[in-house]
Each structure stands twice: as structure tokens, then as C-alpha cells.
Amino acid sequence: MTTEIMQISLSHNPADARWGEKALISTNDQGVTIHLTSHDQLGGIQRAARKIDGQGIKQVKLAGEGWGLEQSWAFWQGFRGPKGQRSVVWAELPANEKTELEQRLKIIDWVRDTINAPAEDLGPEQLAKNAIDLLCAVSCDAVSYRITKGEDLREQNYAGIYTVGRGSDRAPVLLALDYNPTGNPDAPVMACLVGKGITFDSGGYSLKQSAFMDSMKSDMGGAATLTGALALAAARGLKERVKLYLCCADNMVSGNAFKLGDIIRYRNGKTVEIMNTDAEGRLVLADGLIDASEQNAPLIIDAATLTGAAKTALGNDYHALFSFDDELAQALLNSAHSEHELFWRLPLAEFHRSQLPSNFAELNNVAGGAYSAGASTAAAFLSHFVKNYQQGWLHIDCSATYRKSAVDQWSAGATGLGVRTVANLLLAQAKQ
């Protein structure tokens, strides 16, 4: 691996034919040139950065014209990897763009590092504390919080988080964080964010195969994404009150783990029969959504690596979006477009809410055998815990959070996708 700094420049001209038809990069004695000849120029820069990293080049300088904020960020998204050190000498940017780049590097890299962390190093309580540390590093004066853990969850009737997490030696945790930059303790809450923080998911007694378990350190991706989104919105100047709920637990097998046929009784009166212990994310989110609904905020967003069905539909390129609120769903899609992130809305209809039949409880935690729209029925399950589910609620199934192996645009591991979109939406809602 070379230790010299490699100069990287941009060109809108095609590479010399000797580099091959439609070559993305070429080299000369001045360094590496990225040739932007396709309509997706940011994607081209990101793919080129992966190629450069793959050649063992770890120290670079972005030189010449064309390196704006988005071009610089696209390069870093592709250049960054989960192991080894990399350094970039950034091109000169206007002060506001430089600040934005620095905030993204701090916050979105935190999200990626947190999701990539081994489960052994990141339990439920550590995830909650790390989230607090990030938000305090951005705007500590505006942050207050409460951590509820272990038996206290049972005593306070957080039945979902407690039930899922009780099978682990590491106690389950609910983080309730209040971002209130107004200084007024009676200020209305503009938005509530509810994140799934399963720090390892074995599947419980509905045990996963190794091929499906090996990436389950990333099952807290929703919690990390929403933490990063709130931090980035705060860094961008969010002046409205937002509450963050992280529902954190391990889903493990033990003599104390929950079992098929168990019934969970939630604080809102709903009862849920467990027919699959590997459908645990919705069980912990339900507690957070009940709390969020009690705030009467006009906006509730939950995010979770919830279903394999969403990945089957969209792969790892798009996050799946569900909502009964067409206007709000479009607002998020507009934010995603502004931030160059990919979201796709999947169906969620009133009839999905009745596709969770149980013989012994009001709801089943998985859909009946006749209903195969797994991502939609998972979203429908969550809607039963949102007081006004038809308006002001968005569910994000984080299918683009993590990649088990590298592709031409991304290294293996976490992507950080979704952070910018949710931050953008929070700021847009604050202006209304």
C-alpha cells in the first residue's frame, strides 16, 4: 500500500480509449482522474472512490475544479471502509458547505461505525449511552434524557421491550431523549422518533440460520439512523422540540427467553400472541410508539431493520417507506430526493391491519398464512400502537442500512443512508 498522497481530479471528458470503453478512472503522473460521462455523476464519483480504495490507495487529495459539497461527500461514501485508516485532503469549500461536510463526517460516520460495531462491544445500554454522547456533542444544552432498564421496564409496563430482552444477560433498555432547544419545558413536541435497537438478534427460539444471523449486529440500524438524523438536524439548526425513543434489547435464547404462544399485554390495552420470536422488532417498537403517541406530536417516524420482505422487494439500495398519510409520505420522498438518498413507498392499506389474526389475543405478531405481504403486515402491526395512525405517521423499514458484502458503490457494512433524509424532513416540518 502506498503512503504517498494521491491527487484525485474530475473530468467531464471520456478517458483515453486505451483505458477501455466507458472507463471510469484513468491515471497519469499527476494522479487519478475520474471521468464523469454518465448522467449519475455522484454515483460515478462514489463508484470511482471504491475502485481507488480497492487499489490500496488510502491517502488522497481532491484537486482541481468540480469538488463541491455533494461531490466531496459522494467520494467519501465510496472511499470509506470498515477497516483500515483513510485520509482525504478536501478541496476548498465555502464556509457553510465546509461546516455541513464536517457535520456529516462526524455524525454519519458515527452511524456507520455504530452499526458496524460487534454485538459483543455494543449492548442495549451502551447503544443508549452512545446515542446520548453523540447528541450532547452536538447540542448538549438542549438535551435531557431518561434511561429505563431491566426490571424497571417490567414494573413500568414496557412489556414488549422487557419481554424480548429478558432472555439476555444484558438488560433491555428504553432511552427517552428530549431535544428541546426552546428552553421552554412546556414547548409542544414537533416530532417523535422511535428506533428499533436490537443489538443482536439470534431470532430467539425461532432461531435464525447462521447465514441469516451473521449480520444481526446491525439490527439496531433503525435506532442509529434516527439518532444520527436528530443530531444532523440539530447541527443544521433545528429549533423545534423533538423526542427520541430508542427501544434497545438483545433477542437471545435462554431459559428466561420468551416463547411461542406467549401473550404480551401492552399499556394501550392491546394483547399480542407470539407466533414467531424472530418478529421481535415490532414488539419493542410498540412500546416506543405508545409513548410517542402520548406526546400528541404532529409527526411520528419510526425506523427499523424490520423485515426481510422489504429487502426482497427493494434489495439494499432503497429504504422502504410506509404510511397512510399521502402528503407526509410525499414530503419524505421530496426530502430524500433533495439529499440524494433512495426511498421507495410500499403498500400499506387498512385491510393489512386485519391480517394478523390470533386465536388467543387481539393480534398475532406475524401475519396469518394466507397473507404474504410481510413488510406491509409488519407496518400494519405497528399502526395498532399509533393513536392517530392515519395521519402524521411514517414507518421506515431500513432495507438499505447494511450490506453483507461490498458492491461497486459501497464497502461491506453500514451505509448511513436515511440520516440526511430524516434530518431534512425534520427541518422542513419545522418551517411549517
Curated annotation (Swiss-Prot):
Annotated InterPro entries: Leucine_aapep/pepB, M17_PepB-like_N, Pept_M17_PepB, Peptidase_M17_C
UniProtKB keywords: Aminopeptidase, Cytoplasm, Hydrolase, Manganese, Metal-binding, Protease
Record: residues binding Mn(2+) 1: D201, D278, E280
GO molecular function, one term: metalloaminopeptidase activity
Cofactor(s) in the UniProt record: Mn(2+)
Annotated positions binding Mn(2+) 2: K196, D201, D219, E280
Residues annotated as the enzyme's active site: K208, R282
Pfam families, per database record: DUF3663, Peptidase_M17
Main location: cytoplasm
Disulfide bond positions: none
Cofactor binding notes: Binds 2 manganese ions per subunit.
Family (UniProt): Belongs to the peptidase M17 family.
PANTHER family: LEUCINE AMINOPEPTIDASE-RELATED, PEPTIDASE B
Quaternary context: Homohexamer.
Stated name of the protein: Peptidase B
